[in-house]
C-alpha cells in the first residue's frame, strides 16, 4: 500500500509536471517546430540538393562538352573505351550511356 501510494504520489507530480511541461512544450513546440522544421528542411534540402547537385555536376557542362568533342572526333573508338572506363570508375550517367549507344 505504501509503495502504491509512493508510486501514485510520484506519478501525480510527474503527471502535473508533465502537463505543465507539456503545456510549456506546446508553447515551445510552436517555437521548436519552427526551430526543428528549418533544421529538418535544411537536412532534407542538403540531402536532396546534394544528390541533385551531384547528378548535375556529373552530367553538366564539362562532361557534355567532352562527349560532344568525342562524338565529332570518332565516337565508335572513343565510345567503347570511355564507356567502359566510366562504368568502372563512376558507373556512368544514363544520359551519357544513351548518347554513346545512339552514336
UniProtKB/Swiss-Prot annotation:
InterPro entries: PRM2
Subunit structure: Interacts with TDRP.
Organism expressing this protein natively: Macaca nemestrina
Swiss-Prot/TrEMBL GO biological process terms: chromosome condensation; nucleus organization; spermatid development; spermatogenesis
Expression by tissue: Testis.
Keyword Nucleus appears in the UniProt entry: yes
GO cellular component: nucleosome; nucleus
Entry PTM: Proteolytic processing into mature chains is required for histone eviction during spermatogenesis. Transition proteins (TNP1 and TNP2) are required for processing.
Function: Protamines substitute for histones in the chromatin of sperm during the haploid phase of spermatogenesis. They compact sperm DNA into a highly condensed, stable and inactive complex.
Start-end of Basic and acidic residues biased regions: 8-17
UniProt keywords, alphabetically: Chromosome, Developmental protein, Differentiation, DNA condensation, DNA-binding, Nucleosome core, Nucleus, Phosphoprotein, Spermatogenesis
Region Disordered, residue ranges: 1-103
Protein name: Protamine-2
Amino acid at each position: 500500500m505504501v509503495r502504491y501510494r509512493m508510486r501514485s504520489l510520484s506519478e501525480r507530480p510527474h503527471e502535473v509536471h508533465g502537463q505543465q511541461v507539456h503545456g510549456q512544450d506546446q508553447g515551445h513546440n510552436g517555437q521548436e517546430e519552427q526551430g526543428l522544421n528549418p533544421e529538418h528542411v535544411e537536412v532534407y534540402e542538403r540531402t536532396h540538393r546534394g544528390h541533385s547537385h551531384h547528378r548535375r555536376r556529373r552530367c553538366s557542362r564539362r562532361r557534355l562538352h567532352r562527349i560532344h568533342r568525342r562524338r565529332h572526333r570518332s565516337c565508335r573508338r572513343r565510345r567503347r573505351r570511355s564507356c567502359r572506363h566510366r562504368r568502372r570508375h563512376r558507373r556512368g550517367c544514363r544520359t551519357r550511356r544513351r548518347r554513346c549507344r545512339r552514336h
